[in-house]
Amino acid sequence: MSDLAECMLAATSKPRQKAALLVLEDGTTFQGTACGAQGEAYGEMCFNTSLEGYVEVITDPSYAGQVVAMTYPQIGNYGVCIEDAQAAHPALRGLVVRDMCYTPSNWRSNISLPDYLEREGVVAIEGIDTRALVRHVRDHGAMRAVLSTEDMDAESLLAKVRDSELLVGMNLVETVSCTEAHPFDQAENVDSRSFALAPAVPARHRVVVYDCGAKRSILQELVRVGCAVTVVPWNTPASEVLGMDPDGVFVSNGPGDPDAVQATYAQVGKLLGKVPLFGICMGHQMICKAAGGAMEKLKFGHHGGNHPVMNLQTRRVEITAQNHGFNLVFPSLGQLVSNGLGDISDHPDDLRWWVDANRMPIVENKRFGRIALTHVNLNDGTAEGIAFADIPAFSVQYHPEACPGPTDSHYLFTAFSRLMDGHDDYLDIDIAKDRLEGWRF
């Protein structure tokens, strides 16, 4: 065998691996091999449809309490660049992949993905039929799962997973939030990707961020649109926040059941109408809960970078990055306001009706006046964004920071800046121009 052939064989071979087992709470079992830390991990099974960005997914605090399956077949090809991490450490419970790469090729890589998972204590499995797993979760809904490299008895693992905690009712935000207020260090705002982001503009707005599990890229984007950011814990009293004299308040993404995070949405309710607010993902849910909105658990959640969302104001379709398992029940915010809707007085069963009707519905909320539905998911008709008409506040369920994911919705950070500037038409933005001026392409 030639030296070149030996090198190629060494580069593509895998180390001797330990057996691993994945068991779902309905008894479905998948056998594979370990490709991360040793041990057992329990969590809710979900899947992510992103083709790349696994580092950002693994380090996203919103995945706390979950076992994540990547639908793309080969993961780890470009290793792990620590600068891409969204938090200091992964929050997910376990990782499932079809084929793990042990020999990454990328000039930015600091460490291979299997070595990173082992270092961070994340249990992972490879070699299973991830397509079958994803179809099963899609058809039967999200469910508890256990991933083990220690116990190879499926019946034993099934009993243990059925005795594990449910995600519903669990406050996971408190496990990923900061513990004390601190400024976001702009020195952390670095990016050495080959397609660099535009430089941040000078700070002209003071923004307080409720940390429900904030991704680093979100804080970076706030800096890029001119915000001096102070991050505070998830349960910080509204009076403390107002005492900081902010120009705006941002409520971040985060994991778990929004109904369990009462300490946050109670404070958000005290801030609405007193200072401009913007929320993303869990932050959107906190704003909706503060307005009396009800939440529902989705069958298998939205996790990935290919979700089409219609902006009802501009009639543009945005391809969005999403990561949530709960969603707003829009009719729970109030009764429909006429507003040129003709004889329509009852909420349609499917919010995509508003897309077909070319209308943007507005409800009358008992606490905060008129609220418009601004964005609708075209896949399943769920609510994806709202804007308050009588107070300065808006929110979206998806992730406009696009780490990982498409950049279609990056304009929303500019919209927040315009809202703090006092523009009534803050959402009226030339999206194409905004993308060219402030984002990679």
Predicted regions span which residues?
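Short solvent-exposed loop/turn micro-motifs enriched in small/polar/acidic residues
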Residues: S13-R16, H302, F368-G369, L378-N379
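Short clusters of small/polar residues that mark proteolytic maturation junctions
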Residues: A34-C35, Y72, F300, Q322, ...
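Cysteine-nucleophile active-site neighborhood
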Residues: G243, G248, S252-G334, G405-A415, ...
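Short FAD-binding loop at a beta-strand-to-alpha-helix junction that anchors the flavin cofactor
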Residues: P392-Y398
